[in-house]
Amino acid sequence: MRADGATVTFIGTGRGSGAGLVAAAGIDDDVVPMRGLERRLAPKNLIAVALAAAAVPRAMAILRRRRADVVIGGGGYVAGPVALAAWLMRIPVLLTEADSHLGMANRLAAPIARRVALAFPIAGRTGDKYVVTGRPIGPEVRAATRAAGRAALGIADDAMCVLVVGGSQGARTINRAVAQAFGDGPSFELIHLAGAGQLDDVRALLADRAPGARYHLYGYLDNFHDAVAAADLVVSRAGGSVFELAAIGRPAILVPYPHATADHQTKNAQWLVDAGAAVLVPDTECTAERIATLVAELLAEPARRDAMALAARTVARPDAAQAIAAAALQLATA
């Protein structure tokens, strides 16, 4: 949007990882004190409701000062009061939904939005208001290549490589299965992103084993796109990373987090499974034996992996960010 001459600012709580990302992008931000509702009756929810009510006039003042022409809501709990403030000021609202169901903030704000950009088709959410754009990915993901990824991670061009991803906080089931399956030394290059919160646990699992030089264990990598691009096969949860797997075009074994809201990770995984780009393994079936067998089967079948990679790229929407930006600019100038 900035490339098209628009001024972009951000409204948030000033807390969490998002604040750092906004500052790093050189985007001006405004703070609205907020807290999320707990999914049970709790006294803290009274505070959350009071903050939400106070956030509406505060957001109106910010939008007036910023002279906003359009508001884009990202689905977080700040988005609800800001969307309401925009609606009261007759500023068009565009909501974005990153999962396979509408989150609470988007469900509440959808009736007053002009457009809702969906990552996936959602039953009952049809008509001109709803448009399926996919989930935005960064330019570094769109530009990722196998050669660059392997150079960045020191993986030989002719080596087989498997990437294991548990998510930013790690996935105990995946980590345990992979450490048990390949702890005595994989026959391929294994990049294991255990998650910062699980790294010590995985190290303990490997302490009495001999993983060898081909087992590359990390908490996380800032250049995650390089790890995906370097891999011949990915074992992962099925959160937002499924869009990066699709954009880069990597076959995957997906183990959805079983306690995700509305079971959206299973729905995310099923999107790639239905396309022929992934194999789904329920969390309860994610054992060392199951993972070892699937990895061996897929590494032994290059034609199958190629077909899965092509299927992933076919359903990918690498231009999601551009589509959302175009929709927002259209609303701003209508």
Please tell me what each predicted stretch does.
Residues R2-A54, T133, A196-Q198, T284:
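Conserved nucleotide-sugar phosphate-binding/catalytic loop shared by glycosyltransferases and other
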Residues T7, S17, D28, W87-A147, ...:
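Active-site-proximal region of nucleotide-activated glycan assembly enzymes
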Residues G16, L21, A25, R146-A151, ...:
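Donor-nucleotide binding loops and adjacent catalytic segments primarily
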Residues R58-V71, A79-L94, R107-I112:
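Glycosyltransferases and closely related glycan-assembly transferases
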Residues A68-V70, Y218-L221, A229-F243, R250:
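Acidic donor-binding loop of glycosyltransferase active sites
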Residues M89, A229-A231, A246-V255, A275:
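Conserved donor-binding/catalytic loop of nucleotide-activated donor transferases
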Residues R304-P318:
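A short, well-ordered alpha-helix in the C-terminal region of glycosyltransferases
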Residues R317-A334:
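C-terminal alpha-helical cap of glycosyltransferases
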